[in-house]
Amino acid sequence: MDEFQRXSNKHXXWQQLFLXPLFFREDLXAIGHDHHLDRSGSSEPTEIFFSHFFSFLTVKRSIRRIRKQNKSISLFGNSDSNKLIEYNKNFSFKSMLEGFTIVLEVSIAMRSKHFIKGMDGWNXLRSIHCIFPFMEDKLPHSNYISDIRVPYSIHPEILVRIFRRWIRDVPSLHLLRLILHEWKNSFSQENLEKXXLITQRGNTRFSLFLWNSYVYECESFLIPLIKRFFNPXSLLYGSFPDGIHXEKKIKDIVIFLLQKISTKKIWLLKDSFIHYVRYGERSLIALKGTHLQVKKCRYHLFHFWQYYFHLWFQPYRICSLELSKTSFSFLGFFLNVKMRPLVVRAKMLDDLFITDLITNELNPIAPIRSILFSLAKEKFCDISGWPISKLSWTSLSDDDILDRFDRIWINLFHYYSGSINQDGLYHIKYILLLSCAKTLACKHKSTIRVVREQLGSELFTNSFSKEREFISSSFSKTRSQRERIWNSEISQRNPLXXFWQKMENKQIEN
């Protein structure tokens, strides 16, 4: 990226306005591929597929086809519905997606680089577990939380309007419009209503780029708008790209909302504070205030998506909860805020005072029953939690079987190391340990006792290794029993927790 930027400093002004010349840069394919590999983010795929058939010569030919085509003919090939659904086999459409996505990634990344450095109060973190210390510090001082599921079914013209603030090249905007409409028409109506923007079908890079751009647009206007109501002095226009247009749009939205409420109600929001955190499509807004203020915030969120993105925001996508009375799920944890009494002794001269101090504490709880259900689905145990052999792994070597069970336990232990119900995790370990022994016994057509005699202590030491747990136990000698250790190396949700979260989201939607 830096090399490409140094080579184009002389023409930076017109390159920011016009993207069409970038389609004909022969070195952009390699630069865009390296740029994609270097990007960090929890939602990025671990394996990058880059077509060996891709070349910018194909993009040039596709552009010529667009110029010469008849309006009644489909843009990227046969309009037959059966062939259109399988658009990933269409060579022209796939090449156009790859080329256009690379151009957008490089161009927008170059323009937004100095804006990202100037963002005040924004923290982009690599590890999921960095969220939980923040929540432990902020949520106990809040009494309400709004759980928001960001809507992802959006019209292509709204996406074009989003990119219009970044792209001034009219031909590129027309090309983007054609691609987005073809992308929309490539899905059946049922899939379009559920997930048209972040679907895993087709070009993953393109859908990921659309999702990140859409979320950035939402947060660019939503967070300052909320700050305007809760703390009018905290809104900084300098942190926005294209600050003039952003300031104008925000003022218009604020003026519209101010007409709906009186000045007395605005006064109630002055002494409140608000915290915002997001992972993927889930956003949390923690608020200290009254129930009336929570209803106001919910009302403004509905109108924000309705008037700015022109889409219907389903009521189930915003769930407001009182932290002291209920718990909520986030990133595979059950979270609640409970009161913790403390006995404080203060000595003043000859007098000794004993008083009770009550503080709030965030309690992250590992969903043991949901993990057991996931293990049963993966055939590690039955529905009652009794360990069974993993028959599909009996063709592997003993070392591979031990290593796979070891990785499953290590990932679970590290992900839920900060939970308060550690005893339930060791119950999960017991199930995995017996399932491993039964799998080896089934492979060698023997019993668990014979396997233990043959492997000896190797089954219980090398597999499910203790050294990672020893790190946690060594810290526990020098810290309070209530403090927790969060692993800063975890960058994505545990697969078992992700499966449980998907099941819960389906229940909420139904």
Swiss-Prot record:
Q: Pfam families of this UniProt entry? A: Intron_maturas2, MatK_N
Q: Does the keyword tRNA processing apply?
A: yes
Q: Kindly give the InterPro entries that the UniProt entry links to this protein.
A: Domain_X, Maturase_MatK, Maturase_MatK_N
What are the subcellular locations of this protein?
Answer: Plastid, Chloroplast
Question: What's a BP term from Gene Ontology annotated to this protein?
Answer: RNA splicing
Cellular component GO terms held in the UniProt record: chloroplast
Q: Does the record bear Amino-acid biosynthesis in its keywords?
A: no
UniProt KW keywords: Chloroplast, mRNA processing, Plastid, RNA-binding, tRNA processing
The function of this protein is: Usually encoded in the trnK tRNA gene intron. Probably assists in splicing its own and other chloroplast group II introns.
The text of the family note is: Belongs to the intron maturase 2 family. MatK subfamily.
| The protein, known as | Maturase K
Species per Swiss-Prot/TrEMBL record: Thuja plicata
Q: Which gene encodes it?
A: matK
